[in-house]
């Protein structure tokens, strides 16, 4: 039973981290849709703050043993790739 609870907590932790990553993507997409320049200081500040916050959440979950370090890095890498793709798409408009 204890191992089932641990697995459940791990699944919940990863699901919450993925939800936070999705929120960042949506926020950035909205900003990019409404800004004329992706190098806007506000855009960069929001991106930096949100990415830093998510990285700290992931680090905390890893330290608690709820998320594998590789899985956390994979989540951040995926988000960074998607944000880069959004930026590239915006600059090619």
From Swiss-Prot:
Signal sequence, start to end: none
Classification via NCBIfam families: PRK13666.1 (NF010187)
Protein name: UPF0358 protein BPUM_1375
Family indicated by similarity: Belongs to the UPF0358 family.
InterPro entries to which the protein is assigned, alphabetical: UPF0358, UPF0358_sf
Organism (species): Bacillus pumilus (strain SAFR-032)
Domain of life: Bacteria
């Amino acid at each position: 039973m204890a191992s089932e609870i641990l697995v459940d907590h791990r699944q919940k932790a990863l699901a919450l981290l993925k939800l936070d990553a999705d929120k960042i993507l949506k926020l950035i997409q909205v900003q990019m849709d409404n800004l004329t320049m992706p190098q806007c200081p506000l855009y960069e500040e929001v991106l930096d703050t949100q990415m830093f916050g998510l990285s700290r959440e992931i680090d905390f979950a890893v330290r608690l043993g709820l998320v594998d370090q590789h899985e956390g890095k994979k989540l951040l890498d995926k988000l960074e790739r998607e944000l880069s793709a959004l930026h590239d798409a915006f600059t090619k408009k």
